[in-house]
Structure formats: structure tokens, C-alpha cells
Amino acid sequence: MKKFLTAVFAVLTGVFLAGFDASAETPLCGGVTDRTDRTAPKVIKSKEITAFSTSFLLRDETSPHEAIEHWNFTVKKDDTGRIAIEAGNGTTVQADDALLAELQQVIDRFDLAALNGTDRVTAGLPPMFGPCRMSVDYASGERLYFQRNSRPEEGWPRAMRDIFINAFAKKR
């Protein structure tokens, strides 16, 4: 009987653990999740953006408590074929090709294509260093994608924020 119960226990343990995915767990504080595509091209030839998405963190410069602002924007064509910007809060405004050209200028100025394929995030860092990401699709079929921890000293998040703030301000 003891052998039978041991066998049943072993089978049940195997069945339950078969569905367990250790990679789905949240990484421990200081743990690094690295899904970097080291073969991703570091040069994007196209300049014609067809879709754009970004998410980043910035320190609120007006707050005495060093509050963190989370910025999230998506740019794509809407159902009518016009370019639409959607902010993280769901607010949407129409834009034009000039906005896409401005975004591409920031990508070029800060050489963000060099980050293409980077997908590496360290868990448990202070909020200011939380993940930032960018995904850009081009008419040529090329794609720029990266995700990594924020770096407060970098200028591209502020440049992107300013472009989007101006776009929303013009449409109000």
C-alpha cells in the first residue's frame, strides 16, 4: 500500500508541476530579465514611420517631492486613415505627418536605433529607473524596439514628451 501511495503522490506531483512555468514568476529584487535580440539591426534605413508607441518615466520637475510621471503614447492611423495620437489616459487627438517627422528626428538625434533589440530590465530598482520602451514600425517593414530601465540623464524622453504635449496643446 505504501508503494501505491508513493506512486500516486509522484504522479500527482508531476501533473501539478507540469503546468508550472518558472519563467512566468516575477523576478526577485535585483533580478534581471533579459530577452535581448542580439541580431536586431542597429541601423534603421527608413524614415517613414507608420506606427509608434512609447512609455517612459520622468521626474516631475514641478513637484517638491520628486514625484514620478509615467508617460505613455501611441501613434497610428485611425479607422478613417488619419494619424491619431492616444495618450495613456485614453485621450486622442488627430495629428499629421509633421508629428511623425519630429519623432523620427528625436530617434535620429539620440541614436535610438542603436538600442534596437534591447529588452533587458532589472527588477526592484527605484521608480525613477523603472522600465521604458519604444516600438516603431516603418513603411519599409523595418521595426525599432527596445525596453530597458529608465536613465534619468537621457534627453530623449523629455524630447518625446514635449512633442506630444505640443501636439495635444495645438488640438485643444
Predicted regions located by residue number:
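Short, solvent-exposed coil/turn segments at beta-strand boundaries
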Residues: F73-G81, S140
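Positively charged n-region of N-terminal signal peptides that target proteins for export
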Residues: M1-F4
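N-terminal intrinsically disordered, low-complexity segments enriched in P/E/S/T
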Residues: H65-A67, W71
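Bacterial N-terminal signal peptides
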Residues: V8-F16
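Acidic/histidine-rich, surface-exposed loop or edge segments in extracytoplasmic proteins
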Residues: D78-T91
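Short, well-ordered, aromatic-rich surface patches in folded extracellular/luminal domains
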Residues: A22-H65, T91, L99, V106, ...
